[in-house]
């Protein structure tokens, strides 16, 4: 797993900052005033990412309040950050937060998009997990036509991209060609590789 390690300027390991069965997806910065590291990880689920703060003693605080895929851009003094999140049911929302996670202002809500989409039947992704023959758990999503009937046969498209550092199965909002194909009567399936 990718984790944060704290080194001296001379290259000597001081301590491992994070540990566990999850990955640190991005290091966001260090605040010398409160001796804290800020980062994004998938601690709650491999499908979700949240913003965290951890001090030098290991006290960790989750700063993101919304489930789904969160990303952050901190100010140069590490006192404020822009949080961008979405999930399967929520188009991108952007907030201005202080470094404790408190939302100071909501900058983008996408309310007009939500209102427009409420007038249409849009296929939705459904997550699933399965184990391979050798016991490895893989995550996937399936998108069925809106008027899906279990008694009918449908053509199936399997979307697969296993490029380096890629992950396609995430709790994030999108409308893409897969949505279009499901709206045209296809079942679309995606599974992340190992």
Language model features: what each stretch is:
Residues 1, 7-8, 18, 37-45, ...:
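Beta-strand C-termini and the immediately following turn/loop, strongest in propeller blades
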Residues 1-2, 46-48, 91, 151-153:
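Short secondary-structure junction motifs
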Residues 2-3, 50, 68, 126:
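Residue-level marker for the onset of beta-strands and adjacent loop->beta junctions
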Residues 3-5, 50-52, 93-95:
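A short loop-to-beta-strand structural motif that recurs across blades of beta-propeller domains
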Residues 7-32, 41-44, 54-70, 99-124:
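Multi-bladed beta-propeller domains
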Residues 48-50, 169:
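Long, heptad-repeat coiled-coil alpha-helices that serve as cytosolic signaling/dimerization stalks
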Residues 49, 57-84:
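Repeat-solenoid scaffold signature
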Residues 71-194:
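Serine-hydrolase catalytic core recognition
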């Amino acid at each position: 797993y990718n984790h944060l390690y704290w080194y001296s300027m001379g290259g000597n390991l001081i301590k491992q900052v994070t540990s566990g069965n999850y990955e640190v997806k991005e290091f966001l910065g260090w605040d010398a005033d409160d001796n804290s590291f800020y980062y994004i990880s998938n601690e709650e689920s491999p499908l979700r990412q949240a913003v965290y703060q951890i001090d030098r003693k290991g006290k960790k605080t989750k700063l993101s309040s919304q489930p789904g895929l969160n990303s952050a851009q901190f100010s140069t003094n590490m006192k404020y950050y822009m949080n961008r999140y979405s999930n399967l049911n929520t188009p991108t929302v952007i907030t201005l937060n202080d470094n404790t996670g408190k939302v100071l202002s909501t900058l983008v809500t996408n309310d007009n998009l939500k209102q427009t989409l409420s007038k249409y039947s849009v296929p939705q992704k459904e997550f699933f997990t399965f184990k391979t023959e050798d016991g490895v758990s893989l995550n996937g999503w399936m998108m069925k036509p809106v008027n899906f009937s279990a008694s009918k046969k449908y053509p199936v498209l399997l979307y697969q991209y296993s490029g380096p550092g890629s992950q396609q199965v995430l709790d994030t909002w999108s409308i893409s060609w897969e949505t279009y194909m499901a709206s045209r009567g296809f079942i679309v399936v995606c599974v992340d590789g190992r």
